[in-house]
Every structure is written in C-alpha cells, then in structure tokens.
C-alpha cells in the first residue's frame, strides 16, 4: 500500500467516523473488539521510558495540603508549591475548600451528558463559533494523527459567562456550581504562586491571570486494546494554570526527568499544573510540562479540566517575563506575546514533537 493510498483510506475512515456523530463512545457501544487503525499510536511513543531500577529517583507527584495556608505554616505551604512548580510543573492539592459533594456532582454530570442519547448531544456540535458550550466528538480529527480515544465537551465560563440555558440540562447546575468554586480556588492559588515567586500576593491577579476560564470535560470510553492508543496525546497547556479533577480510574501521566510518571487519583484532591503562559511570564522559573492520558480496558474514565486562560476571548494585553523577576544575571528568555496570537499557533501545532513555547524564545 502506498503512502497516498494510506492517506485516502484514513480520510475515508475519518469521514465515516464523523458521519456517525456518535463519537468514540459510539464505537464502544457498537461492541468493536479492535481499535481502528486511525487511533493506533507507535509503540515507541507509548513506552514509559522507565528504567528497571528507579530506587534513586523521586517519581511521586507532590501532594500539598492547603489547609495550613492561613496559619503560621503558610510559608511552608508556599515553599512546597514553589518546589513543585519549579521541579515538576504538577502537584495535587487537598483541603482546598471545594466541597466533596460538588466534586462528585460535576463528575456525575459529565458522565450523564456523555452517556445520554447522541441525538441530544449532537445539538451541541460546533456548528458555529458563537456557542458557549460545544460537544467535540471530533475535537482533533483533522489535526491529530493518530486520533485520541475520547469524547469531550467545552464550556466557556469567563470573562463572559454563558447564559444558563446555553448549558445542557444534564450538567447545567453542576457546571455553574463547580466553576464558581474553581474561580475561588484559583484566586487562592495565584496568591500562593505570586508569593512563591517572591512577589506581592496580588501580582498574578493584577495582570489578569484569573480573568479567563474555560472547562474541558473528557469522557474516555473503555478501550478494547488500550496498549495501542492514547486517551490524549502528549501536550502542554496554553493556560496560566490548569485545575484538573479526575475520577478514580487513573491514566494521567506527566513527563518528569524523561520518564512518564503516573499521577494516581487521590480521593478529594485536585491536580494543578503550570501552563505555557505561566512559564513565559516567570521566565522559566515555573515549568509547563508535557502530560498525556493512557486509556483503560474496563471502565469509562471522567476528567474535568479548568484552564485559567483568556485564549479564546478578545484580549489585546501583551505578556512577557515579569520585570521584577529579571536581572543582568537572569535576562528575559521570551519575546512578548498576546494570548490570542499564541493560541492560534498553539492549536495548529498542539501535538507537534516540541513545545510551541519554544517558538517564542529569544
């Protein structure tokens, strides 16, 4: 088979997949026993690259208790966040004040939406650019090769909140309640991160890191051959900060010291990761690192990611490394950017081999 005929076959497979309008879940509901070739990932990419002897390595993503942030131990919390942001780019937080009932309801509402009749879900397909809630069962079909094993929906929360009626009834109240708590927790985290940089606690808020928020909710159906594909290919986030709620299934991995490290679910915890914009404005002090999701064979996996970013809203603000972090010994490493400009290029190259952020290095 020639390369050209392979491309034609793939395009035909994609066209058929799109026409069903049932997403990856539709494949599973049809009781397929083999993963279609358009989802296949080379085995070299799927490898964890982990040596047999890891006794000398710290491969545990930090877990930070935020319960002491308003006590005399605040500096201890800040120190832990600083270390995690500098060395991992990822950490989990507990005692974050988001009620467990709210966490459980948003996960259940994401499940409800994705497991309802496709006819209902398809009302939210991306037919125009003005929708505040979009169902993406073909989120990256023409940009990702191979395809990812997931279905998703996106909801744009801030700075321009959607009308409640724009959010499907299956998840409306849960989305509104959960994102309210996420905005409150985001304000706390940006204060702590500001202090971890040695700056005034309101610094990151003042430059509008908290201004924009959108959520991306993934449903990963059980995969008959999980060793052949990925739920999400490796990538970094085009955000200042991302808050992720994952269920107890597992599958999230972060690249640390060239190894893919599991981020095990911790009941009641939220995963926090540094985004590209934060790495840029901190001049590489905080790291935006690659991460991915492995599918599983037994049960669907749910995740709820909230991105602090105004990347999909008009925003003329110019961002560059924060001046107070620079010196003769630590000059600016990045050019100035606007968020929309960066996002356009990021989305066009999201699954490239190298981080898009490298394009803005001086």
Swiss-Prot record:
Chain positions recorded as 2-oxoglutarate binding sites: 301
Induction (UniProt): By ethylene. Slightly induced in leaf blades in low light intensities.
Species of provenance: Arabidopsis thaliana (Mouse-ear cress)
Keywords: Iron, Metal-binding, Oxidoreductase
Binding residue positions for Fe cation: 235, 237, 291
SUPFAM superfamilies: Clavaminate synthase-like
Cofactor: binding comment: Binds 1 Fe(2+) ion per subunit.
Presence of the UniProt keyword Transmembrane helix in the record: no
Cofactors demanded by this protein: Fe(2+)
Similarity comment text for this entry: Belongs to the iron/ascorbate-dependent oxidoreductase family.
GO function terms (MF aspect): 1-aminocyclopropane-1-carboxylate oxidase activity; dioxygenase activity; metal ion binding
Identification of the protein by name: 1-aminocyclopropane-1-carboxylate oxidase homolog 10
Pfam family name, one: DIOX_N
Lineage summary: Eukaryota, Viridiplantae, Streptophyta, Embryophyta, Tracheophyta
EC top class named in words: oxidoreductase
Taxonomy, superkingdom: Eukaryota
């Amino acid at each position: 088979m020639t390369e050209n005929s392979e491309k034609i076959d793939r395009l035909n497979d994609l066209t058929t997949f799109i026409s069903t309008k049932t997403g990856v879940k539709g494949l599973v509901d049809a009781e397929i026993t083999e993963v279609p070739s358009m989802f296949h990932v080379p085995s070299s990419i799927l490898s964890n690259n982990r040596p047999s002897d890891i006794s000398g390595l710290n491969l545990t993503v930090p877990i930070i208790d935020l319960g002491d942030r308003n006590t005399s131990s605040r500096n201890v919390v800040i120190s832990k966040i600083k270390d995690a942001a500098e060395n991992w780019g990822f950490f989990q937080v507990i005692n974050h004040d988001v009620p467990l009932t709210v966490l459980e309801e948003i996960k259940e509402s994401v499940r409800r939406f994705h497991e309802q009749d496709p006819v209902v879900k398809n009302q939210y397909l991306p037919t125009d650019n003005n929708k505040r809630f979009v169902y993406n069962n073909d989120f990256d079909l023409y940009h990702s090769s191979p395809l990812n094993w997931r279905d998703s929906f996106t909801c744009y929360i801030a700075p321009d909140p959607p009308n409640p009626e724009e959010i499907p009834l299956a998840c409306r109240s849960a989305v509104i309640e959960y994102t309210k708590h996420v905005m409150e927790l985001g304000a706390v985290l940006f204060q702590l991160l500001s202090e971890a940089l040695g700056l005034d606690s309101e610094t990151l808020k003042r430059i509008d890191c908290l201004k924009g928020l959108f959520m991306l909710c993934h449903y990963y159906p059980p995969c008959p051959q999980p060793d052949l594909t990925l739920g999400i290919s490796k990538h970094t986030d085009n955000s200042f900060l991302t808050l992720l709620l994952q269920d107890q299934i597992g599958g999230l991995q972060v690249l640390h010291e060239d190894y893919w490290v599991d981020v095990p679910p911790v009941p009641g915890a939220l995963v926090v990761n540094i985004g590209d914009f934060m790495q840029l404005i901190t001049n590489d002090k905080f790291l935006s690192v690659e991460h991915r999701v492995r599918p599983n064979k037994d049960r669907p996996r749910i995740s709820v990611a909230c991105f602090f970013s105004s990347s999909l809203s008009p925003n003329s603000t110019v961002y560059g490394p924060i001046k107070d972090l620079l010196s003769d010994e630590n000059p600016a490493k990045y050019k100035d950017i606007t968020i929309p400009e960066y996002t356009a290029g990021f989305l066009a190259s999201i699954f490239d081999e190298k981080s898009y952020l490298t394009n803005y290095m001086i």
